[in-house]
UniProtKB/Swiss-Prot annotation:
UniProtKB keywords: Mitochondrion
One GO cellular component term noted in the UniProt record for this chain: matrix side of mitochondrial inner membrane
One of the GO BP terms on file: mitochondrial genome maintenance
Family listed: Belongs to the RRG1 family.
Subcellular location: Mitochondrion
Organism: Vanderwaltozyma polyspora (strain ATCC 22028 / DSM 70294 / BCRC 21397 / CBS 2163 / NBRC 10782 / NRRL Y-8283 / UCD 57-17)
Superkingdom, natural source: Eukaryota
Protein name as it appears in the record: Required for respiratory growth protein 1, mitochondrial
C-alpha cells in the first residue's frame, strides 16, 4: 500500500521548515497588514487542503509554488503576489463579481509598485545612506557640521568618512570581542515538569544556527509531559466516580460502607513523585474491600504507567547528560569547545590581516577603504 508523504521524515521536515520561512517572510517583507492577512490565510487554507494529497506530481507542484512564493517575498516582488493570492488555494476569484477587498488591495499594490519604481535603490545604497545620516546627526549634535548641507557634499565628501568611521567602530567592536577569548561552551537546560532537558549552547549553534531537531525535541517533550498531566487529571476524575461506584456496590452486597477516604486515596494516586508512588504501590495491596480493589485497580495501573513514563524520560535526559554531553573525554562539550577554538583562531587571523593593512587604508579611494578591507577578509558580512 502506498505510504502517505507525512510518513517520510525528510518530507515533513522540509515542508515544516519551508512553511515557517514563508510565514516569517510574509510579516518581514510585506508592509501592508491586509496583504499579510490575505497571504497568511490563503497559505494556511492551502496547507490544510493539500494535507491529504497522495499525488506526487501535485505535491511537487505545490511545493514549487511555495518555494516561488518564498523567493518572491524575499525579493519583494509585489506585483507577483497579486497573482499568487489566487494560485495558492487553486480557486480563481470570479472576475465578473470582483471582491471590493481585492480591488482595494490591487490599487494599493499598484501604488506601492509605482512608488518603488520611482524610488528604487539597492540595499547597499540604503545601508550607506543610513550610515551617512547617523554620521551627520552625530556631528551636528556636537556642532561639528552645519545644519544645512548640500547633497553633493554629502555624497562626495561626507559619505566616505561616514563609512570609514562606521567601519572603525565595527573593527573596535570585534577587537573587544576577541580580547575576551574564545566564546564559552556552556551546558544549559529547560524544564518539562520534573524532566530536565539538557543541551549545549555555543557560538556555533545559537540563534538561526540552532538545531531544528533540538527545537522539535523540546517542544515534543513538553507536549508529551502536558498530555501525561492531563491524562492523570482524567484518571483522578474517573477514580472519584469509581470509588463511589465501589462504595455503592459494597453497600448492596455487604450492607456496610467501606472505610475509605476518597480524597486521600485520589491524592495518593495522582502524586507525580516516583518514590511516593512506590510507597503507594505497597499501600494499595492493603485495600481489603474486594469491590473497591476491583474498581480502583485499572485506574491505579493507568496512573502508574503514566508516572513510570515520566520517570523514564527524566532518567533518559540525566543519562544523556552524563554519557553524551560529558561522556568520555567530555563528549560533545569537548567537541564544541574545539570547534569554537578553531573558529576563534580564524577570526583572530582575519582581524590581524585587517589591522596589518590599516596603514594602506585611504577612505576616499574606492576599493582602498576600510569597509572593503573588512568585507574582503570576511570580518564584516555584506
Amino acid at each position: 500500500m502506498t505510504s502517505h508523504f507525512s510518513s517520510l521524515p525528510a518530507h515533513r521536515s522540509y515542508i515544516f521548515s519551508l512553511y515557517r520561512d514563508v510565514l516569517r517572510n510574509i510579516h518581514r517583507c510585506c508592509y501592508s497588514v491586509e496583504l499579510q492577512n490575505i497571504l497568511t490565510s490563503k497559505l494556511n487554507l492551502t496547507m490544510k487542503q493539500q494535507k491529504g494529497t497522495m499525488s506526487s506530481w501535485k505535491a511537487h507542484s505545490k511545493i514549487k509554488e511555495l518555494e516561488e512564493l518564498n523567493d518572491r517575498l524575499i525579493n519583494r516582488d509585489l506585483p507577483y503576489l497579486k497573482e499568487l493570492i489566487n494560485n495558492l488555494s487553486g480557486n480563481k476569484i470570479n472576475s465578473t463579481q470582483p471582491n471590493q477587498y481585492v480591488q482595494d488591495l490591487k490599487e494599493a499594490t499598484n501604488l506601492i509598485n509605482e512608488y518603488h519604481s520611482n524610488n528604487s535603490q539597492s540595499i547597499e545604497t540604503i545601508k550607506k545612506m543610513d550610515i551617512l545620516n547617523r554620521y551627520i546627526k552625530t556631528k551636528q549634535s556636537k556642532h561639528l557640521l552645519p545644519k544645512e548641507i548640500s547633497n553633493v557634499y554629502k555624497e562626495s565628501l561626507l559619505l566616505p568618512f561616514a563609512i570609514h568611521e562606521d567601519s572603525i567602530y565595527k573593527l573596535n567592536k570585534l577587537h573587544n570581542q576577541l580580547i575576551r577569548g574564545p566564546p564559552r561552551v556552556r551546558l544549559t537546560n529547560t524544564k518539562a515538569g520534573k524532566i530536565t532537558i539538557w543541551f549545549l549552547r555555543s557560538a556555533l549553534n545559537k540563534k538561526d544556527r540552532q538545531s531544528k531537531k533540538l527545537k522539535l525535541r523540546i517542544a515534543k517533550e513538553k507536549q508529551k509531559h502536558q498530555q501525561r498531566i492531563d491524562n492523570i487529571k482524567t484518571c483522578e476524575k474517573y477514580a472519584y466516580w469509581a470509588l463511589l461506584e465501589a462504595s455503592w456496590e459494597s453497600l448492596l452486597n455487604t450492607g456496610k460502607l467501606p472505610t475509605i477516604n476518597i480524597n486521600k486515596t485520589i491524592n495518593n494516586l495522582s502524586t507525580l513523585d516516583n518514590e511516593d508512588i512506590n510507597i503507594n504501590r505497597k499501600n494499595n495491596h492493603h485495600i481489603k474491600d474486594i469491590h473497591v480493589k476491583e474498581w480502583i485497580e485499572p485506574i491505579t495501573y493507568s496512573i502508574k504507567q503514566l508516572v513510570d513514563k515520566e520517570f523514564e524520560r527524566k532518567c533518559h535526559y540525566e543519562n544523556y547528560k552524563k554519557i553524551i554531553l560529558y561522556g568520555k573525554n567530555n563528549g560533545l562539550i569537548d567537541f564544541f569547545e574545539n570547534k569554537t577554538k578553531v573558529m576563534y583562531a580564524r577570526r583572530v587571523s582575519r582581524y590581524k590581516t585587517v589591522v596589518n593593512g590599516l596603514p594602506f587604508i585611504i577612505p576616499t579611494i574606492p576599493r582602498r577603504d576600510l569597509r572593503t578591507a573588512l568585507l574582503d577578509n570576511k570580518v564584516l558580512l555584506p
